[in-house]
């Protein structure tokens, strides 16, 4: 022990449970251990079986294992260019204030003393949550002591379990613990300058995205991937919903998709087997390999605590702990920061941890105790520096986000906290400067000014792209090997076409187009040859019955107001990094001027969409709508995909409904149902790194319909998808339309592959075949019969002849004149970016049909 704090217990006594020793290492197989130790000496990463064997090392074998791990650690520090002021390699720490926002939780982990109940809090004279002034007082005192980090720790969703928590939040105007956490993080930034590191437990994609603008980093211990500990009565995680390994792995993945610098780790000695422990490490490695977001891995030893169900369980043995730390280093590699809490071991054990490959001590506070382990005081910083020096390293202070993320800028750190980070970061190393934090406004970036390649809307047709790909192609999209593995998994599920099934499905569809089974729709989607001709003929007949022979179009202008985006959609060739030669942004004045130009040319609609630029102010979307409506009051504003709406919601802290209403009140008329791609997450997470999940797309679109904002619907196909995904996607759209009736049309969007990163990486097909195009348009007409009357085809992506084929196979609408189009053109489409009214009329007349101009919502013009 390094010292002691007076412990005040806030927890209720729990009945002890009989647990065996957490880990009983199997008797090592000598030859297997020798082989693994040799591979470790040679610098090889260990697979799961090898990791299990390595964790049995003891005595001289353990020393050998630790020496190999230490060499790997040192190579990583050398490669990163890290040195202390004295020239020695550094071991880092974060000087922090521990802020226990609430000790309430909906879970009941058997080893936890942090969590308590409302009655116990009252007995201690404590509130359900720390009040704002309590949080700020802690943060201010920490700032005075040179702390840079405010560690917000709390139980999972206490309001779900405790009425007292719900009441406390409601009395103060908050609808959830996470809303309160967000507000307090902002106040700490503004009033003290400390950098929040948020540990609120399990969160959804949307919750993570709402918190990213208020914190440079977040964390959640994976703890273990053992389902046995979660599902078996009496074991450590039984009865704790949020300790489901599947759920926790999903959080880890979502953090990666959102490019959040993320801390995770494992607990050693809570009843897991060595195989389960090794699997936990490999799952962390797998997630980090795909996204590169795991900034540090905590390897934490179990310490039994009084008044818990696991009070009688022995602490993790030091040899077992050291072996696990060394294996973590060998599994996770030289670039990973491996962290061990120095307060959970003795001084001598700290020295041993350094020899095992540790290079980070985590957060250490000169002010507050470790509220999760209150019986284990932090070492004084001078003591920690001394033991680090004795081990041959220099103790160096870092920020809550590790240096490589600090230095990467907007790709990882939201602009709203970027200024706070820069104020505390050494500009050369990304480590902490020797300054005390000072509060500064948490504010929106300045209004967007026109910048970059503003003429790309016209130059794309004459000059093309300046570059083949964005500048961060190698890092923006995650690990391509992992992505290709996901694609192979999807390909293994492709259906087999059987002609007799197609004919039977066709007969069923002729009787009741909207009433077929999924298997029958799948058969129609795989039709080819004469069967495909019959399917498209049925679709064309349905089109004629529903909307007649008129081919409709709208006179509109696309205005893509920026192509700067860090979302990481792997199919997208439009997105650019700020500073790339093809990157641009348009000011609201420029957007309004383009809307006026469109109005003069007869346009009734502008369609506005853009990249997810982290520097776009939260008011940016509303400002764009108002700018257009002010310049051209009669213009129909069709704008902002569900992804853009999700971005606005995350930045503003509003609910989806509140945000959509604010856009509607500013003048927004309808929204495009883009960003759908394929509404199946197993496909979406291959197509895109960070775009919103299917469930949130559905929530945003249905909410838009409910507040009076109708939308189009779309599906992008021909990449890593297959017919079963088309059927499932259309079923989702049918379900939404049954609930809301808010879709105006369905637009199949063929994947344009030429410049797509996903295609260039060898992970996607070269777009759909002509058979695919015909089958998708026909299937849409059949499946959406009686629900969505209008099926649009894209002349931009298909060209004139294939567009005409779609009009003869179920489609009835040509979309718009567009006037400018950069998304498909930057992807490699060769069919131009604008059509005149005369050219659209000619497309229809070329197949003996009449073209009619319409409004956005399909009222005929001049009728």
From Swiss-Prot:
[4Fe-4S] cluster 1 binds at residues 105, 109, 112. The keyword Transferase applies. Its EC number is 4.3.1.32, 2.5.1.147. Keywords: 4Fe-4S, Iron, Iron-sulfur, Lyase, Metal-binding, S-adenosyl-L-methionine, Transferase. Binds 2 [4Fe-4S] clusters. The clusters are coordinated with 3 cysteines and an exchangeable S-adenosyl-L-methionine. The keyword Lyase applies. Residues 91-343, 551-792 form the Radical SAM core domain. It comes from Mycobacterium leprae (strain TN). In the N-terminal section; belongs to the radical SAM superfamily. CofG family. Residues 92-424 are annotated as: CofG-like. It catalyses: 5-amino-6-(D-ribitylamino)uracil + L-tyrosine + S-adenosyl-L-methionine = 5-amino-5-(4-hydroxybenzyl)-6-(D-ribitylimino)-5,6-dihydrouracil + 2-iminoacetate + 5'-deoxyadenosine + L-methionine + H(+); 5-amino-5-(4-hydroxybenzyl)-6-(D-ribitylimino)-5,6-dihydrouracil + S-adenosyl-L-methionine = 7,8-didemethyl-8-hydroxy-5-deazariboflavin + 5'-deoxyadenosine + L-methionine + NH4(+) + H(+). Pfam families: CofH_C, Radical_SAM. PROSITE patterns: RADICAL_SAM. Its cofactor is [4Fe-4S] cluster. Pathway: Cofactor biosynthesis; coenzyme F0 biosynthesis. GO terms for molecular function: 4 iron, 4 sulfur cluster binding; 5-amino-6-(D-ribitylamino)uracil--L-tyrosine 4-hydroxyphenyl transferase activity; 7,8-didemethyl-8-hydroxy-5-deazariboflavin synthase activity; metal ion binding. This is FO synthase. Residues 528-861 are annotated as: CofH-like. Catalyzes the radical-mediated synthesis of 7,8-didemethyl-8-hydroxy-5-deazariboflavin (FO) from 5-amino-6-(D-ribitylamino)uracil and L-tyrosine. [4Fe-4S] cluster 2 binds at residues 565, 569, 572. Gene3D superfamilies: Aldolase class I.
């Amino acid at each position: 022990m390094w010292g002691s704090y007076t412990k005040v217990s806030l927890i209720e006594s729990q009945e002890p449970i009989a647990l065996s020793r957490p880990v009983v290492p199997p008797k090592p197989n000598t030859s297997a251990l020798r082989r693994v130790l040799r591979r470790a000496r040679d610098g090889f990463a260990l697979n799961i079986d090898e990791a299990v064997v390595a964790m049995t090392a003891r005595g001289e074998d353990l020393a050998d294992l630790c020496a190999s791990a230490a060499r790997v650690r040192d190579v990583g520090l050398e490669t990163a260019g890290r040195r202390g002021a004295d020239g020695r390699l550094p071991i880092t720490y974060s000087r922090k204030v521990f802020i226990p926002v609430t000790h309430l939780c909906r879970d009941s982990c058997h080893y936890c003393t942090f969590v308590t109940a409302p009655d116990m809090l009252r007995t201690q004279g404590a509130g359900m949550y720390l009040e704002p002034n309590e949080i700020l007082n802690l943060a201010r005192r920490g700032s005075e002591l040179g702390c840079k980090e405010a560690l917000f720790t709390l139980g999972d969703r206490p309001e779900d379990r405790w009425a007292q928590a719900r009441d406390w939040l409601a009395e103060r105007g908050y609808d959830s613990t996470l809303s309160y956490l967000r507000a307090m993080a902002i106040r700490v930034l503004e009033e003290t300058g400390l950098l929040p590191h948020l540990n609120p437990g399990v969160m959804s994609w949307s919750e993570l995205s709402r918190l990213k603008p208020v914190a440079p980093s977040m964390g959640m211990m994976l703890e273990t991937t053992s389902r046995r500990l979660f599902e078996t009565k009496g074991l450590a995680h039984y009865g704790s919903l949020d300790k489901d390994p599947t759920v926790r792995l999903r959080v880890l993945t979502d953090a990666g998709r959102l490019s959040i610098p993320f801390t995770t780790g494992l607990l050693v000695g809570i009843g897991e087997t060595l195989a389960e422990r090794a699997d936990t490490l490999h799952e962390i490695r797998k997630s980090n390999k795909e996204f590169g977001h795991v900034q540090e891995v905590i390897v934490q030893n179990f310490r039994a605590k009084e008044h818990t169900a696991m009070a009688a369980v022995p602490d993790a043995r030091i040899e077992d702990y050291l072996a696990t730390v060394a294996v973590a280093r060998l599994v996770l590699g030289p670039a990973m920061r491996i962290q061990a809490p120095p307060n959970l071991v003795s001084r001598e054990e700290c020295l041993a941890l350094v020899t095992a490959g540790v290079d980070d001590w985590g957060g250490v506070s000169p002010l507050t105790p470790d509220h999760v382990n209150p019986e284990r005081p932090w070492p004084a910083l001078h003591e920690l520096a001394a033991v680090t020096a004795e081990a041959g390293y220099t103790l160096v202070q870092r920020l809550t986000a590790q240096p490589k993320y600090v230095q990467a800028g907007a790709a990882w750190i939201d602009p709203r906290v970027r200024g706070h980070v820069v104020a505390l970061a050494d500009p050369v190393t990304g480590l902490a400067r020797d300054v005390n934090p000072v509060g500064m406004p948490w504010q929106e970036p300045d209004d967007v000014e026109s910048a970059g390649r503003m003429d790309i809307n016209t130059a794309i047709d004459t000059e093309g792209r300046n570059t083949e790909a964005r500048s961060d192609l190698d890092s923006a999209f995650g690990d391509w090997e992992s992505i290709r593995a996901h694609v192979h998994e999807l390909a293994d599920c492709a259906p087999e076409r059987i002609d007799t099934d197609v004919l039977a499905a066709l007969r069923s569809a002729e009787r009741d187009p909207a009433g077929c089974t999924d298997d029958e729709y799948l058969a129609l989607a795989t039709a080819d040859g004469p069967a495909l001709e019959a399917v498209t003929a049925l679709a064309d007949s349905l089109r004629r019955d529903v909307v007649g022979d008129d081919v409709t179009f709208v006179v509109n202008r696309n205005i893509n107001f920026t192509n700067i985006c860090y979302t990481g959609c792997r199919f997208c060739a439009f997105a650019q990094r700020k500073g790339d030669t093809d990157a641009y942004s348009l000011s609201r004045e420029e957007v309004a001027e383009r809307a006026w130009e469109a109005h003069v040319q007869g346009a009734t609609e502008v369609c506005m969409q853009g990249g997810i630029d982290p520097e776009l102010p939260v008011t940016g979307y509303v400002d764009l709508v108002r700018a257009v409506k002010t310049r051209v009051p009669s213009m129909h504003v069709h704008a902002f995909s569900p992804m853009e709406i999700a971005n606005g919601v995350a930045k503003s802290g509003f609910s989806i409904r509140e945000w959509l209403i604010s856009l509607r009140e500013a003048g927004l008329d309808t929204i495009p149902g883009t960003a759908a791609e394929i509404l199946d997450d197993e496909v979406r997470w291959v197509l895109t790194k960070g775009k919103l999940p299917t469930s949130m797309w559905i929530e945003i679109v249905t909410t838009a319909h409910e507040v009076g904002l109708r939308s189009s619907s779309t599906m992008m196909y021909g990449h890593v998808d297959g017919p079963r995904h088309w059927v499932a996607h259309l079923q989702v759209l049918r379900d939404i339309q049954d609930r809301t009736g808010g879709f105006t049309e369905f637009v199949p969007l063929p994947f344009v592959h030429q410049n797509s990163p996903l295609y260039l990486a060898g992970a996607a097909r070269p777009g759909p075949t002509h058979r695919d195009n015909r089958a998708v348009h026909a299937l849409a007409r059949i499946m959406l019969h009686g629900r969505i009357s209008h099926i649009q085809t894209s002349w931009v992506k298909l060209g004139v002849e294939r567009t005409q084929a779609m009009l003869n196979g179920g489609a009835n609408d040509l979309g718009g004149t567009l006037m400018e189009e950069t998304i498909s053109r930057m992807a490699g489409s060769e069919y131009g970016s604008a059509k005149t009214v005369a050219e659209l009329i000619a497309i229809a007349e070329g197949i003996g049909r009449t073209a009619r101009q319409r409004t956005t919502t399909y009222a005929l013009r001049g009728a």
